Amino acid sequence: MNKIRLRNANYLRENFINYYDKFFEVQIADVNYVHSYYTFSFTLKEDCSFNRKMLSLHLESKGIETRPMMAGTLPDQPGLRNCNGIIVGDLKNSRYVRDNTLCVGVHPLLDIQDMDYVLEEMNDFLSRNK
């Protein structure tokens, strides 16, 4: 099952790097580690003409489930606001990732045709939101 998740994540990553580099940053996995992917995440670049919510709404309307990323911004969570803890820095990068990163699933029951559908809908969205 993990091999299929990895295949799906790598397929999306390769396509994002080759075709969507103008719009998104993607994680590059360290070759010295084995990763277990549940989602493929990508972060909007600062100069995008659209935001995460716009893209998420488009993908969701096409039956592609998306999720945001928490990205280490626990102090911003309502249930943790009154907890005492040490916060180092202003969490600027964590907040940027939280606000501009989107995740799509790479479940083992999804095949390459499903990944191609995600890419088709990305193309559709990007062609109208350059």
Residue ranges, per PLM feature:
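PLP-dependent aminotransferase class I/II
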Residues: 1-130
